[in-house]
């Protein structure tokens, strides 16, 4: 395991540091966590995990992202990453697509992809040579040391503001990607996809009340998609559970509209005194 990543990981049971031992990670109190043969480490607490993405959903997302449709989003996310960053984590990383872009922008950094979905972590473990993949639940407490991260990514994923602040350095950066109201509007109308919450901005601000907004970009661009790509787009997220299956003459032009925002800890000035 990459040394920088191992030094940042903590036992999810007792919060002690971890060390490698015969293919597993162990803490001084004897808690042991296996590394799956697919490359990720399971740092769950034994509690029932939230329902993660299915194998089909992950395959759809991987195909869609690798086709380059969200390359502009990935580039914008990477643009908020300081080149000097040493450790980057993506919470709700999925396949590791955005983490890989961030690591390319910070040539000396190591990365941690955290997710609850094993099918996603199998891909995230191979997303970048400088990345490790960890199964962990953001709501159970991240298995990371206090103030260990230079950058934390959160792309279309659940947010735990208090935990984000705990694991981020005082001078660190949080980069959050959220959909705007027009995101995938054509598909929402035609296939009954879930609407973007009109109060999303207010809820986001409340969740991240320990952070100050330091930069943001709104992106809106057309996606010209084949019928198979429309099916992949519908099937790669939570809409897969709620929407009708796209038909053979699926819409070929869809609007993507997202906001990429960067935040800094609100108490960073006090920490620097």
Identify the meaning behind each predicted range.
Residues 161-173:
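A short glycine-rich, Lys/Arg-flanked "PGG" loop and its adjoining helix->strand segment in the class I
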Residues 1-51:
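N-terminal auxiliary segments of SAM/dcSAM-dependent transferases
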Residues 6, 217-273:
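Conserved Class I S-adenosyl-L-methionine
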Residues 50-76:
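Class I SAM-dependent methyltransferase Rossmann-like catalytic core
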Residues 115-119:
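Conserved SAM/SAH-binding beta-strand->alpha-helix loop
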Residues 84-94, 173-203:
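Conserved class I S-adenosyl-L-methionine
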Residues 95-107:
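Conserved SAM-binding loop of SAM-dependent methyltransferases across substrates and taxa
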């Amino acid at each position: 395991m990459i040394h920088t990543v191992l030094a940042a990981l903590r036992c999810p049971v007792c919060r002690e540091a971890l060390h490698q031992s015969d293919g597993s990670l162990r803490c001084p109190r004897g808690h042991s966590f296996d590394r799956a043969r697919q490359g990720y480490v399971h740092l769950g607490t034994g509690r029932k995990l939230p329902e993660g993405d299915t194998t089909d959903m992950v395959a759809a997302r991987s195909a869609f992202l690798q086709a380059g449709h969200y390359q502009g989003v990935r580039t914008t996310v990477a643009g908020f990453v300081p080149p000097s960053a040493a450790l980057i984590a993506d919470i709700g990383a999925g396949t590791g697509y955005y983490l890989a872009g961030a690591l390319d922008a910070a040539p000396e950094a190591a990365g941690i992809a955290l997710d609850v979905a094993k099918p996603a972590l199998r891909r995230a473990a191979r997303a970048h040579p400088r990345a490790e993949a960890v199964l962990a639940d953001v709501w159970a407490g991240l298995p990371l040391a206090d103030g260990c991260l230079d950058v934390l990514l959160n792309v279309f994923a659940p947010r735990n503001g208090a935990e984000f602040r705990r694991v981020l350095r005082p001078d660190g950066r949080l980069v959050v990607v959220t959909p705007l109201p027009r995101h995938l509007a054509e598909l929402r109308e035609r296939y009954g996809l879930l609407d973007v919450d009109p109060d999303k901005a207010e809820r986001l601000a409340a969740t991240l009340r320990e952070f100050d907004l330091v930069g943001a970009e709104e992106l809106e661009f057309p996606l010209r998609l084949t019928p198979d790509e429309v099916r992949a787009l519908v099937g790669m997220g939570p809409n897969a559970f709620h929407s009708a299956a796209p038909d053979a003459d699926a819409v070929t032009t869809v609007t993507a509209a997202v906001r990429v925002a960067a935040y800094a800890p609100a108490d960073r000035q006090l920490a620097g005194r």
